[in-house]
Amino acid sequence: MGVYTFENEFTSEIPPSRLFKAFVLDADNLIPKIAPQAIKQAEILEGNGGPGTIKKITFGEGSQYGYVKHRIDSIDEASYSYSYTLIEGDALTDTIEKISYETKLVACGSGSTIKSISHYHTKGNIEIKEEHVKVGKEKAHGLFKLIESYLKDHPDAYN
């Protein structure tokens, strides 16, 4: 088994407290509302929303994937950090055992810097290259931009 790590960083005009509330704490409600083509439904299968919680994410019609299940590994509202691991679903191919994600929002001027790290745990001697994860990174960034746009259009939301 190999582990391949990829990092991504981008900025936002939105402060980390608002972004964290929308992008992490209320994502299960907000994303299906503003981007049903991306995520149709998010539901908690086990747990209370904290570490150890298992969620099922059902993707929107036209997505190349049907669903994934992920486990929340950590969530820290004080440091605006969140980590979770994909543990089941058709995004995990026969070559990938699991994918772990770490996200941290950091204050940057009046906005934020979003730092994301993904760890792909492969089966056997399979190698994951940056170009293999590029499409997923672009989709995640696009979804983030939708949330950012929603927050700009709704300045009283998630304060």
From Swiss-Prot:
UniProt keyword Magnesium, yes or no: no
Documented effect of changing residue 58 to N: Reduced capacity to bind specific IgE leading to attenuated allergic reactions in human
GO biological process, alphabetically ordered: abscisic acid-activated signaling pathway; defense response
Gene Ontology, cellular component aspect: cytoplasm; nucleus
Entry-linked SUPFAM superfamilies: Bet v1-like
UniProt keyword Electron transport present: no
UniProt keywords, alphabetically: Allergen, Pathogenesis-related protein, Plant defense
GO molecular function: abscisic acid binding; protein phosphatase inhibitor activity; signaling receptor activity
Site-annotated residues for Crucial for IgE recognition during allergic reaction in human: 11, 31, 58, 113-114
Annotated consequence of substituting residue 11 to P: Reduced capacity to bind specific IgE leading to attenuated allergic reactions in human
Family membership noted in the UniProt record: Belongs to the BetVI family.
Name of the protein: Major allergen Mal d 1
